[in-house]
Amino acid sequence: TFPPTSSDGDVAFERALTGSVPASENVAVKIQYNNGGVPSADAYLDYIILEAKRNLQGYGKQFRFQYNDADLNTGVIQYQLSSAARITQVWDITDIYNVQKVENNGADAFSFKAYMGEDRNYIAVDASDFYSPLKDSRTRVANQNLKGSILKNAQGSFQDLDYLIVTPAFLNSQAERLANFHRTNSNLNVKVVNLENIYEEFSSGKQDIGAIRNFVKYIYNNGSIPSKKLKYLNLFGDASFDFKNRISNNTNIVPVFQALNSFSLGGSIMSDDYFTMLDDNEGTMLQTGSQDMELAVGRMLVSDLKQAEEMVTKVIEYHAIESYGKWRNNFVLISDDVDVAWENSIQTGIDALGDQISAQKPFVNVEKIHTDSYVQEASAGGFRYPKARKDFVDAINQGALVFNYFGHGGEDGLAKERIFEKADAQNLNNRYKYPLFVTVTCEFTRFDNPYRPTAGEYTYWNPKGGAISMVTTTRQISVTTGQDINDAFSNELYGYGTTNNVPISEALRVAKNNYNGSALMVSYVGDPAIRLAIPKPTIVLTKINDQPVAASTFVFNALSPVKLSGEVRNVEGNTILSNYNGSLSVNIFDKNVQRTTFGNDGVTDSSGNLIVMDFILLGETIFRGNASVANGQFEFNFVVPRDIAIPVGNGRISFYAKRNQGLEDQTGYNTDIKIGGINPNATADNIGPRVRLYMNDETFISGGITNESPIFLAFLEDENGINTASGIGHDIVAILDGDENNPYILNDYYETELDNHTKGKVRFPFRNLAVGLHTITFKAWDVYNNPVTAEIQFIVVGDETVTLKNVLNYPNPFVSYTQFWFTHNRPYEPLEVQVQIITITGKIVKTINQVVTTEGFLSREITWDGKDDFGDKIGKGVYVYKLTVKSTLTNKKTEKYEKLVIL
């Protein structure tokens, strides 16, 4: 019986065992499995190799042989072969580039000698068993010259290359679309090179990751000067562990480096760093020693043209005008709870990172979601943090520049309590607010397994939401490595002590190069040339109630009217940008709040004390406003809500500005303002706000139809403004279908109108509502805590079908002009609409075809002048018309008939 194997968590084991077997042609191997007393435990046998000594005897085939103990001995060994008449030669293939041979002149028995001290490998060549080279079906190869053309421009002159995109030919169109964007938007010299061409020139046409690396090295080594060498490498395609395409639905689009050790999650590294280690004697990919990355690398996980188009579109949208907004001031950190004592370093480590970012880059609004500070609830599947999960997903949908998670995780999601899963990733709806997703966890984005798509991949793949890019883990990572890399990466990403803004992938490259250890399990997923969309400095508060800030002693008392003035200045903060015109968004926060985690799992330290953590949160948002910026200057007014915390202390103002002409954005902050106390001279106000409710747009009428994910709109007005300070019982809330135990808190979704703090709007997206009638009860408060309540009803119809209601034409009867109106359930979708005018005898006299897209559910875009298809005026009288609407996404259609009268 062979001895049992054991392990501390490896997924497979290889063991060389020595035993005695009978000297016969048939050998039986018996395996006895010890389950350790666990009936449910299983072992999975891959294969057994039986290796034994045998006589060197010819048998009509060529064969390989070696003496395994040769390296353990010194001196000379003699090999004797029998039945060797047909063995013409013995080859020494120990060095495949220097093969030696021993001749046999037809003797039935012959021998040769060799020195011991090392293992040597031989092949006995039988004259009747010569192998024939395989014939490649692709015998014609087109002329090409990558080496001669890659560093030349269209005119044939030398030009350094900034950005290389490597992709197979079938993805070329979208790779070129991305390249064209960066040529125009990023001023980079970009080239797209197909894998097939790289293989032809660097590996004789065969798939070889070494060929890709050697091609990249050739470009890098031939840059004109160090500062102009190749900077970015985009591996434009998904990857797989199966290089040989043996499995169905494989994703081996652009191959990735795979470590030889495939038996453990810690050792079975896959990494794209291999392609960037370009100095001499680098590229061994050992997890020890120093091997620097010479350029930044990223992989866009795309497997077909549709997916490629979606991911390139996200890159373009990340830079579009619609993506500019105050969400770019936000950073969200999320920590796992403490299940065992050593895990306390997870939450304390990332909390310290958040505080460091606040100190180094004070314009950043750091939101902290420490799961252990939420109430833990028991469920059938284990303990959960439903409120933390909701806050996590809501924060993504509302927008933040970076999400940074530290804790346990895996291919299916984050944390044992499942605070973020695959379904969450697929249902995110944060278009134009795509964040960088940083996950310090295990295997969250293990993208080389086609059998099991991960939550990380779904986060990236979401075409209308999710992440723009990810710094993420593909295998197991230790807490120490994760903490060190996360801190170093954040330092480079935000440029501590500087105003630098390097590409995200470059920040990771520098962090990994500076790390004294291996971080091969950390990968960058996404376009390596994009930079984090950090607004530029500097927006400055200059006056409070017309008094210079430096001289002001004003305290923001509850119910005090406040006027704030400021300027948009240059990066250094010393010169106003007098040609700056645009808009400003502002958030004013109450004093910071200190919180303590709960220690939900009851874990204690070595002294028996419950492990909890004190941490600092931003105060409640007491005002969200918008103002115009004219010639670099702005001002706005608001009334401080009654619900501020009364003790006086430092508050915070967060500014964000967007320029109208010459698209750019700026940021700023102030933490010197004082908030607290009550205004004893506040004017009386006992009148509540006024409100109007709609679904999707202002044409909606209560009781109308919607799709399954409508937008709820509430337009509010009050002479002193709306309260968003989250005082107890004074939140802006929506109650769906009377479920008061699960209200929707809408404070964060309220924004004032431009230059008017007395009016504003709530815009909240509902998701996946059930088909049927629904009622929303809405309640809001003004800053004096006077309430308003209103209600709206709507009918959800399934999104798969096209639903028509309220089909009419206006005016009707008409003389020379009418519009065709209808409500539908397909907002934001191009609809093919046809209107046919028919006489009472059935003759079609006019056909109108038009594609319409509406933000809401009402369409009134189609007009008719009363003329037929030939341009002639048709006669007076009654006509029938058929209105047909077809979805361009599902090809489903519906139609309705109505009457019209021409006078």
Residue ranges and their predicted role:
Residues 537-539, 681-693, 774, 802:
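Proline-centered linker/hinge motifs at extracellular inter-domain junctions
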Residues 785-789, 844, 871-873, 892-895:
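A structural signal for beta-strand boundary/capping segments at domain termini and interdomain linkers
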